[in-house]
Amino acid sequence: SKLGVDLYNYEAESVEVYKNNRFLKFSSTTTQNKKQKYANIDYDENKDVLIVNGSSFKGTTDKNFIVGTWWNHEIIKAKAQISAISGRIIHQNVNFLGEEKITINNKEYSTAHYNFSSSDKKLSKNKKLNTDIWYDIKSNLWIKASFDKTGYWEYRLKSYN
């Protein structure tokens, strides 16, 4: 907030469910600058597809598309991700940028650094994906994310048990 005025407000709550390492369902509600958004995604075992009911997309999609919550390392292999905020399908390019050492809370991690970008170049700038993600090389644990959207944002691992 600046001079008592909120410049950006974001609140989200989500649940992602897997059984035997297989995606079952995801649900989220998000308030972003007073706009309500949601995403509900279910795996339909009979049709072998994902059913998406979101504020930006409703329909079925490939079961190999992954919810864009970043913790699932398999996202680096996916042709598209599903927005955890709105259910929007985001076709992506993933580029490996190299290995890097990152220190967080006095602990050093050897990481693999990736850039995720929208493969659809016609999207408006505010809809384009352009996010850097770092995964621990040994465990594939999500260590860090950064992106530039209404300012530079960086998320880092706080602790890991």
Regions found by a protein language model. Give the residues of each.
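Hydrophobic, well-structured mid-protein blocks that either form specific transmembrane helices
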Residues: 26-70
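Acidic, serine/threonine-rich low-complexity disordered tracts
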Residues: 1-44, 74-161
